[in-house]
Swiss-Prot record:
Gene Ontology biological process terms, A to Z: translation
GO terms for cellular component: chloroplast; small ribosomal subunit
Protein name: Small ribosomal subunit protein uS12c
SUPFAM superfamilies: Nucleic acid-binding proteins
Swiss-Prot/TrEMBL keywords: Chloroplast, Plastid, Ribonucleoprotein, Ribosomal protein, RNA-binding, rRNA-binding
Alphabetical list of InterPro entries matching this protein: NA-bd_OB-fold, Ribosomal_uS12, Ribosomal_uS12_bac
Subcellular location: Plastid, Chloroplast
Length: 122
């Protein structure tokens, strides 16, 4: 415990909260351009080829974003919308690409779980 004299000399520093998605700069989503689309393998007990894209955002950051869903049309120079949200088994991937907006089309033949940019079936 500090003494009163020590507290007068220099006050307590407030705990600063660190953002988990700094590249978004406090915005809910950001637009960006794909610079490279490729696959990477997940951490240990999992095994797959996860689709990711290197994206240059309008905020100036270059980030790695996950492409969710089965099949995608993203390629180099595609304009995509990026949201926060990490992928637990991919180290360094802290963003998701939003399907169904800009150049990223929704997942084909999707009926349920339509958070993949799919219109509601009539």
């Amino acid at each position: 415990m500090p003494t009163i004299k020590q507290l007068i000399r220099n006050t307590r520093q407030p705990i600063r909260n660190v953002t988990k998605s700094p590249a978004l700069r406090g915005c809910p989503q950001r637009r960006g351009t794909c610079t490279r689309v490729y696959t990477i393998t997940p951490k240990k007990p999992n095994s797959a080829l996860r689709k990711v894209a290197r994206v240059r955002l309008t905020s100036g950051f270059e980030i790695t974003a996950y492409i969710p869903g089965i099949g995608h049309n993203s390629q180099e120079h595609s304009v995509v919308l990026v949201r926060g949200g990490r992928v637990k088994d991919l180290p360094g991937v802290r963003y998701h690409i939003v399907r169904g907006t800009l150049d990223a089309v929704g997942v084909k033949d999707r009926q349920q779980g339509r958070s993949y940019g799919v219109k509601k079936p009539k």
